[in-house]
């Protein structure tokens, strides 16, 4: 019983600490989803993205990044304008955010596979997002409302289970 309560406490502590991480770069790892890395992903289930990329406005990319030449400066700039507000979600490689976003970018833009992965390269950490490009806290809270309510539900269930274990 004590082992179970310690494990639950450790799980709660990890979930709280993981919510404090933030980034101002779009990691190069997000481009792996565009490169169709199948072998490693077959056995790994990814959590659902808290951002609904389905109904986003992709004209910021499709109006600037046009074929047949797909100019890198315009394409990468437009990609960063679109993606930088979601760096935290896109850099979470345990979620399907990057895969989902690239699916819709390619659906609406009809881009060749790997276009952004091959053209958009900056530093060791990935694409640098300009200061202030991340979502402000109130907008971020709206985007992540599903995650927040889900996290609260799990915390409540975990706490209830912990109390139940302690009582019996």
Swiss-Prot record:
How does the protein's chain sit in the membrane according to the entry?
Answer: Lipid-anchor; GPI-anchor
What is the protein's major site of localization?
membrane
**Glycosites:** 57
Residues lipid-modified (GPI-anchor amidated asparagine): 144
State if Signal is listed as a keyword: yes
Sorted alphabetically, which InterPro entries does this protein's record hold?
A: LORELEI-like (IPR039307)
KO phenotype (gene knockout): Retarded growth, collapsed root hairs, defective trichomes, abnormal accumulation of high levels of anthocyanin and overall reduced plant size. No aborted seed phenotype and normal production of seed sets.
Top-level lineage group: Eukaryota
**Cellular location(s):** Cell membrane
Prodomain residues = 145-168
Q: Give a GO cellular-component term.
A: plasma membrane
Q: Which residues form the signal peptide?
A: 1-23
Tissue expression, as annotated, is: Expressed in pollen, pollen tubes, sporophytic pistil tissues, in the early stages of female gametophyte development, and in unfertilized, mature ovules. Expressed in roots, lateral roots, shoots, cotyledons, petioles, developing leaves and anther filaments.
Provide one Gene Ontology biological process annotation: positive regulation of growth
- Key words, A-Z: Cell membrane, Glycoprotein, GPI-anchor, Lipoprotein, Membrane, Signal
Q: Which PANTHER family match?
A: GPI-ANCHORED PROTEIN LLG1 (PTHR31533:SF2), GPI-ANCHORED PROTEIN LLG1-RELATED-RELATED (PTHR31533)
**Role, per record:** Component of the FER-regulated Rho GTPase signaling complex. Acts as a chaperone and coreceptor for FER. Required for localization of FER to the plasma membrane.
Q: How does it assemble?
A: Interacts with FER.
What is the name of the protein in this document? GPI-anchored protein LLG1
Q: Tell me what organism the protein belongs to.
A: Arabidopsis thaliana
Starting at the broadest rank, the lineage of the source organism is: Eukaryota, Viridiplantae, Streptophyta, Embryophyta, Tracheophyta
């Amino acid at each position: 019983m004590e082992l179970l309560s310690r494990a639950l406490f450790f799980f709660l502590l990890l979930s709280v600490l993981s919510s404090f991480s933030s980034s101002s770069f779009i990691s190069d790892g997000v481009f792996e989803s565009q490169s169709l890395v199948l072998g490693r992903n077959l056995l790994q289930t990814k959590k659902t993205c808290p951002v609904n990329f389905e109904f986003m406005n992709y004209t910021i990319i499709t109006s600037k990044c046009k074929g047949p030449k797909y100019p890198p400066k315009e394409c990468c700039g437009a990609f960063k304008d679109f993606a930088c507000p979601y760096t935290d979600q896109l850099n979470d490689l345990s979620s399907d955010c990057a895969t989902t976003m690239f699916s819709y970018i390619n659906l609406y833009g009809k881009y060749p596979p790997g276009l952004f992965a091959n053209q958009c390269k900056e530093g060791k950490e990935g694409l640098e997002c300009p200061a202030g490009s991340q979502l402000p806290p109130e907008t971020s809270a709206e985007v992540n409302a599903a995650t927040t309510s889900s996290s609260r539900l799990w915390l409540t269930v975990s706490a209830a289970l912990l109390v139940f274990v302690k009582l019996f």
